[in-house]
Swiss-Prot record:
InterPro entries the record matches: Aldolase-II_Adducin_sf, Aldolase_II/adducin_N, Aldolase_II/adducin_N_sf
Outcome (variant: residue 457 to A): No effect on cleavage by asparagine endopeptidase (AEP)
Annotated site residues (Cleavage by asparagine endopeptidase (AEP)) in this chain: 357
PANTHER family named in the record: ADDUCIN, GAMMA-ADDUCIN
Ranges where the record places region Interaction with calmodulin: 684-701
Tissue: Cleavage fragment 1-357 is expressed in the brain and the expression increases with age (at protein level). The fragment is expressed in the cortex, hippocampal CA1 region and hippocampal dentate gyrus in tau P301S transgenic mice, a mouse model for Alzheimer disease (AD) (at protein level). The fragment is only weakly expressed in non-transgenic mouse brain sections (at protein level).
GO molecular function annotation: actin binding; calmodulin binding; protein kinase C binding; structural constituent of cytoskeleton
Modification type Phosphoserine: residues: 31, 42, 64, 402, 414, 423, 442, 461, 583, 585, 590, 673, 677, 679, 681, 683
Lipid bilayer topology: Peripheral membrane protein
Name of the protein in its database record: Gamma-adducin
Key words of the record: Acetylation, Actin-binding, Calmodulin-binding, Cell membrane, Cytoplasm, Cytoskeleton, Isopeptide bond, Membrane, Phosphoprotein, Ubl conjugation
Organism: Mus musculus
Residue positions, PTM N-acetylserine: 2
Length: 706
């Protein structure tokens, strides 16, 4: 085909009505130095600049008066409609933040429902001079001021609540003059002494009202048992204080108050006569004081008890005012007998917890259970009271009998120092280890069971998996420790110095670290008992405390004769002189005669010398029998033969006839005669001769010379 016949490409120009679209590069001047700087900038830095620009625009919008007015109008319209969704609460908090930032910290009441000043502001203040007890008391007192404000008891003049925090130094904390009850916090309270001098100013520059503080100081000085004083004069209490009848026992609240004291208050208690009169009126146990034509005062050993009485005083006064107005006078009211119903009302209220203690293991003080409920209410509203609750609100989940109360064995965790901070990662690792140890130390018995797996479609799979199930055999299940440890110092004796307890604990921990083995703790019950040791069996070894040895029959011999006798003994031990056994009978007879004379209890002093001479001569002439009598255990055969032959011999003396039988294996107790020589009782048996001490000494000398 030729080129002329090929189809040509036809281009259609754009219609003239379409406008020209501006591109990005048409708006940018490439020679602009600002554009060149941004183009050469790194991407991360360019992104940071963009975020800063966006935040600047958001800040400008939030700080603009127009946005604040629009937001307030929106919230007002939503509140008029009655709806209160979560989004509205979020907008309300934003509005509170903006309004408080714009108006120097003063917020609008209609917009401050979601934002309140926290009561416990001590973490942000300088609290180095406060001890732990004072911090808790400050939080309690500030919470009590907030409750008085919420109940409508606040008054601009002479209405105060005070607490004594130190009985030794008479330090009292009270709210300063000019600070409303709704602004009371733990750090704004002022600490003064009993005469009104400031000890700790707190976080404000305001001063206390000495006129309003004078009744508190007078009560504290007259009643050392009082810790808290609450003084109010609401409409109901002021009205009842002006009645001649006073508080009438016409309601349960009035019966709970018990004895009520009345005092003609003149506006101040600075004079000594007035304080003496107040002391007479109060008495030792009165908890409610009526100031005539002024108001009411409640006393308490704790803050909770004082609040308990002031709350019932307010309720009793309101009931009385309404009853008098409705009945047309006091004469038309039914007045109860206070003494008759005191045991059912005041006695139960004074027992603590409104009678809850009668069937509960938790012992509550007067007004404490009600005060904790109000503190939980304030905490739920966001007041952050800082109150230390005694018991949790939510009851613990009931556990099965097989659950472990305490691990069966002691865990092997490493002890951490109390002062050193614990990292979160380390805490999580220890938590996992504790769970594992709790599982391993469980006293429950488990069985390994193969359970078939289930497939996705619901059918049973041929494969099985291992599952641990609790053993049904109750005999194999061991019980845990029945004692529940609620306090780490549960087994520490009472009235013990805490420093000594910590030192003892650290010492025990050190012993556990180094694995020291000791005999264990010493019993305090058996520490002072002296145990008598049983008498030991008779021993024939030479000792210093034993009975005195018999007189030495060889004391008159010379050294040469002793050496010759020693050599003779050695030859006999070596078996060199066996042919001389024929003279056994004669020598044995002489030995038996000597024994009868030395062991007889009727031996006389005149014959002692003859016996000793005969005894010494027999030992000098004695060969084999002497060796057997003074020998050791290796000569048992010869000794038995001697015993058999000597037993046939009898010796007749001038005093009495004694038949001697020598039994070598037996040992008898020695009985000494008055002269120190051993004697024999007729009821006791013979014993063999001991080895003389001088022979042992000679053997030792020979060994040393060798």
């Amino acid at each position: 085909m030729s080129s002329d016949t090929s189809p040509a490409v036809v281009t259609t120009p754009p219609p003239p009505s379409m406008p020209h679209k501006e591109r990005y590069f048409d708006r940018i001047n490439e020679s602009d130095p600002e554009y060149l700087r941004e183009r050469n900038m790194s991407p991360d830095l360019r992104q940071d600049f963009n975020m800063m620009e966006q935040r600047k625009r958001v800040t400008q919008i939030l700080q603009s008066p127009a946005f604040r007015e629009d937001l307030e109008c929106l919230i007002q319209e939503q509140m008029k409609k009655g709806h209160n969704p979560s989004g509205l609460l979020a907008l309300q908090q934003i509005a509170d933040y903006i309004v408080t930032s714009s108006f120097s910290g003063f917020s609008s009441p209609s917009l401050s429902l979601g934002m309140v000043t926290p009561i416990n502001d001590l973490p942000g203040a300088d609290t180095s001079s406060y001890v732990k007890g004072e911090k808790l008391t400050r939080c309690k007192l500030a919470s009590l001021y907030r409750l008085a404000d919420l109940f409508g008891w606040a008054h601009l003049a002479n209405t105060y609540i005070s607490v004594r925090i130190s009985k030794e130094q008479d330090h009292i904390i009270i709210i300063p003059r000019g600070l409303s009850f709704s602004e009371a916090t733990a750090s704004t309270l002022v600490k003064v002494n009993i005469i009104g001098e400031v000890v700790d100013q707190g976080s404000t520059d305001l001063k206390i009202d000495h006129t309003g503080f004078s009744p508190h100081a007078a009560i504290y000085s007259t009643r050392p048992d009082v810790k808290c004083v609450i003084h109010i004069h609401t409409l109901a209490t002021a009205a009842v204080s002006s009645m001649k009848c006073g508080i009438l026992p016409i309601s349960q609240e009035s019966l709970i108050l018990g004895d009520v004291a009345y005092y003609d208050y003149q506006g101040s208690l600075d004079e000594e006569e007035e304080r003496i009169e107040l002391q007479k009126v109060l008495g030792p146990s009165c908890k409610v004081l009526v100031l005539r034509n002024h108001g009411m005062v409640a006393l308490g050993e704790t803050l909770e008890e004082a609040f308990h009485y002031i709350f019932n005083v307010q309720m009793a006064c309101e009931i009385q005012v309404q009853a008098v107005a409705g009945a047309g006078g006091v004469d038309n009211l039914l007045v109860l007998d206070l003494q008759k119903y005191k045991a059912f009302t005041h006695g139960v209220a004074m027992s603590g917890g409104g009678g809850v203690n009668m069937a509960s293991h938790q012992k509550w003080k007067v007004g404490e259970i009600e005060f904790e409920g109000l503190m939980r209410t304030l905490d739920n509203l966001g007041y952050r009271t800082g109150y230390a609750y005694r018991h949790p609100l939510v009851r613990e989940k009931p556990r099965h009998k097989s659950d472990v109360e305490i691990p069966a064995t002691v865990t092997a965790f490493s002890f951490e120092d109390d002062s050193a901070p614990l990292s979160p990662l380390k805490f999580m690792a220890q938590r996992q280890q504790r769970e594992k140890t709790r599982w391993l130390n469980s006293p429950n018995t488990y069985m390994k069971v193969n359970v078939p797996e289930e497939s996705r479609n619901g059918e049973t799979s041929p494969r099985t998996k291992i599952t641990w199930m609790k053993a049904e055999d109750s005999s194999k299940v061991s019980s845990g420790t029945p004692i529940k440890i609620e306090d780490p110092n549960q087994f520490v004796p009472l009235n013990t110095n805490p420093t000594e307890v910590l030192e003892k604990r650290n010492k025990i921990r050190e012993q556990n670290r180094y694995d020291l083995k000791t005999a264990g703790p010493q019993s305090q019950l058996l520490a002072g008992i002296v145990v008598d040791k049983p008498p030991s069996t008779m021993q024939f070894d030479d000792d210093d405390q034993g009975p005195p040895a018999p007189p030495n029959p060889f004391s008159h011999l010379l050294e040469g004769e002793l050496e010759e006798y020693t050599k003779t003994i050695e030859r006999k031990q070596q078996g060199l002189d066996d042919a001389e056994q024929g003279s056994l009978s004669d020598d044995a007879a002489s030995v038996s005669q000597i024994q009868s004379q030395t062991q007889s209890p009727q031996s006389v002093p005149e014959r002692l010398e003859e016996n000793h001479e005969l005894f010494s001569k027999s030992f000098t002439s004695m060969d084999a029998p002497v060796m057997i009598m003074n020998g050791k255990d290796e000569m048992h055969d010869v000794e038995d033969e001697l015993a058999q032959r000597v037993s046939r011999l009898t010796t007749s003396t001038t005093i009495e006839n004694i038949e001697i039988t020598i039994k070598s294996p037996e040992r008898t107790e020695e009985v000494l005669s008055p002269d120190g020589s051993p004697s024999k009782s007729p009821s006791k048996k013979k014993k063999k001769f001991r080895t003389p001490s001088f022979l042992k000494k000679n053997k030792k000398k020979e060994k040393v010379e060798a």
